[in-house]
A protein has these predicted regions:
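Hydrophobic transmembrane alpha-helices and their helix-loop junctions in integral membrane proteins
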Residues: 1-138, 142-173, 179
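Glycine- and aromatic-enriched alpha-helical transmembrane segments of multi-pass membrane proteins
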Residues: 185-186
Length: 186
């Protein structure tokens, strides 16, 4: 529907300050979301910052006002929804609701379905292939590069920061943990 409206009404495609607001706001969300996800104090904060990142990607796609960007943004929103559902399912199996990174340590070995769910959700947020986030981010990245190469260069640091934060989460899921033996009362 949105794509049809964009092709029927040319005045929707005129360059306005609103378009620049969408693009700059989305770029800020991508970079800030990636940086905050890398420095997240808890896994719950990580997923909140990952949602900021993925929302920023979608806003940039919509802000480009081209068919490729709008299609990528729609796919990014579908990816975000599915990643949230999978992450919620993974967190249901985590003891203490994952209030600390130590709660996730070794989760991939002790509760494999929860570890896989959290790993897949993290990879979806960061747009790793073959998940739906990758084609969404690729379409938006290509549309940004076609519109102005500097936009693509500005998206890249946020993507790299998010990828690094995903590796942090994945390492936490598979590395051996101490468990909760340190808290066992005598």
């Amino acid at each position: 529907l949105v794509l049809r409206l964009l092709t029927e009404y040319d005045w929707l495609l005129t360059v306005t300050p609103l378009i620049y607001t969408f693009i700059l706001g989305g770029l800020a969300s991508v970079i800030l979301g990636g940086a905050l996800a890398l420095a997240a104090p808890t896994p719950r904060h990580w997923f909140a910052y990952a949602m900021i990142f993925s929302t920023g990607i979608a806003v940039v796609g919509f802000g480009l006002f081209v068919q490729q960007g709008a299609g990528g943004a729609a796919l990014a929103l579908v990816n975000r929804t599915l990643a949230i559902l999978v992450a919620t399912a993974g967190f249901r199996a985590v003891p203490n609701l994952a209030t600390h990174w130590d709660d996730l340590r070794g989760m991939g070995r002790h509760v494999p379905p929860a570890g896989v769910a959290l790993g897949v959700a993290a990879a979806a947020f960061a747009a790793f292939p073959p998940l739906a986030g990758f084609p969404a981010a690729w379409l938006i990245y290509r549309a940004a590069f076609d519109a102005a190469p500097v936009l693509a260069y500005l998206l890249a640091p946020g993507m790299v920061l998010m990828a690094l934060s995903v590796f942090r989460l994945l390492v936490t899921l598979v590395e051996p943990g101490e468990g909760h033996a340190r808290e066992t009362p005598l």
